[in-house]
A protein has these predicted regions:
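Signature of extracytoplasmic/envelope-associated structural regions
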Residues: 1-399
Length: 399
């Protein structure tokens, strides 16, 4: 019988000790992936010895590199409450890419409270119980009870927070100042970790048509969030595009376990997309974290190198965005000025199924017009500098 591509399965677990495989559970640690590419490549050294003829001997085999890539749909955890620590499988990938998992398991305050005095369309002044430390709520979801009639439209996000005045700058511009209640809802957040601590590694199992690979010291070497807009003409799921490197700890013949069906993925539509204080149209937004992994040389290891470590990340945002008139949205002036602007995407209709991407500050590169289709669009990058919580991903549980 032939091995079949569809009989592919993947499981992952946070690894506690370098070079020691932690076996993932074949029930609770199974992650649905797609578009897998997997490579085992030889590391060779040319043999330059003379042979007394025009012919040369083959290369010496020095070792191997193991790498791959896959996509995983950006499916929220769902359920009625925030998952337990480290239970959300996509979160393990994010932690290995230098994100911190932050669980807000109780809303703040537990019951919605009255706003303070002085709110305007871009700021919500929180009530007396709100935190007094700057940026406590930066990058997090917030519910403002009077900004919309539907529950999911009452959810927005905090760009910056000033503790002394309890003023939360918002990621969108409201039609009128909020004047009723506020609450920081329960949420599972992944906030970019700016500490010097090394990103953790993963232990993974990969089944390819009845053959299992145990991969140790699995390091996320590339990460992109690809969020296409679903329209009346075409639809596509938001996803994480993941690259990895690893070492083979073991391999054996083993039937691929079943990967559970997890239901539909929320699509990016009927939501919010704000850039620089304007609700904009477009067909996609992609965040590339520009990860780079290196391997310290060490002859005590089988391959002559220690496990890979993240050594660099350079984050950019690329959009295919609707083009506007100068008076509406002047990207040329914004690029020339090099000020910081917020980028905010939100979608999903239900509590536990809502997704937010919050980039509080990013700078425009020059944007190029694209005239090749029915509508003129602009394409170009925005640069994300090194700030605390410079990119946040929230899964929101709201009442």
């Amino acid at each position: 019988m032939s091995r079949k591509s569809n009989e592919t399965a993947f499981a992952l677990k946070m690894q506690t000790t370098p070079n020691v495989f932690d076996a993932p559970n074949t029930t609770t640690d199974m992650l649905a992936i797609s578009n897998l590419q997997f490579s085992i490549a030889g590391v060779t050294v040319t043999n330059n010895e003379y042979t007394g003829s025009i012919h040369k001997n083959g290369d010496d085999l020095a070792g191997k590199t193991v790498s791959g890539s896959f996509n995983v749909y950006l499916r929220p955890p769902g359920g009625a409450d925030v998952p337990a620590a480290d239970a959300f499988l996509i979160g393990r990938i994010l932690k290995a890419a230098k994100f911190a998992e932050v669980r807000t398991s109780t809303a703040i305050p537990p019951a919605a409270a009255a706003l303070g005095v002085g709110s305007d369309p871009t700021h919500a002044v929180l009530g007396t119980a709100a935190a007094t430390v700057d940026d406590t709520y930066k990058g997090m979801a917030i519910v403002l009870s009077d900004i919309a009639t539907t529950a999911y439209d009452r959810v927005t996000a905090v760009r910056h927070y000033v503790g002394t005045s309890k003023s939360a700058e918002l990621m969108e511009v409201l039609g009128a100042p909020p004047a009723a209640n506020y609450q920081i809802p329960k949420q599972l957040s992944y906030q970019r970790d700016m500490t010097q601590a090394d990103a953790p590694s993963l232990s993974t199992k990969l089944w390819l048509g009845g053959l299992r690979y145990d991969l140790v010291d699995c390091q996320v070497s590339g990460l992109r969030w690809n969020v296409p807009v679903s329209t009346r003409d075409a639809a596509s799921q938001p996803m994480l595009e993941v690259s990895f490197t690893a070492t083979i700890a073991n391999y054996d013949d083993e039937a691929s376990p079943t990967v559970p069906a997890l239901g539909a993925v929320p699509l990016f539509k009927d939501g919010k997309f704000w850039v620089a204080g304007k609700a904009v149209g477009g067909s996609s937004v992609v965040i590339d974290f520009g990860l780079r992994v290196a391997y310290p040389p060490n002859p005590n290891y089988t391959e002559g190198s220690e496990p890979g470590e993240l050594v660099e990340s350079r984050t950019t945002i690329n959009m295919d965005r609707k083009a506007y008139l100068k008076a509406q949205f002047d990207t040329l002036a914004m690029a020339q000025g090099q000020a910081q602007y917020g980028v905010f995407a939100q979608w999903g209709y239900a509590s536990g199924r809502m997704v937010q991407i919050v980039v509080p500050d990013a700078r425009f590169n020059y944007q190029s017009p694209n005239v090749g289709q029915d509508f003129i669009t602009e394409q170009g990058d925005m640069w994300v500098d090194v700030f605390n919580r410079n990119v946040c991903l929230n899964f929101v549980y709201y009442a």
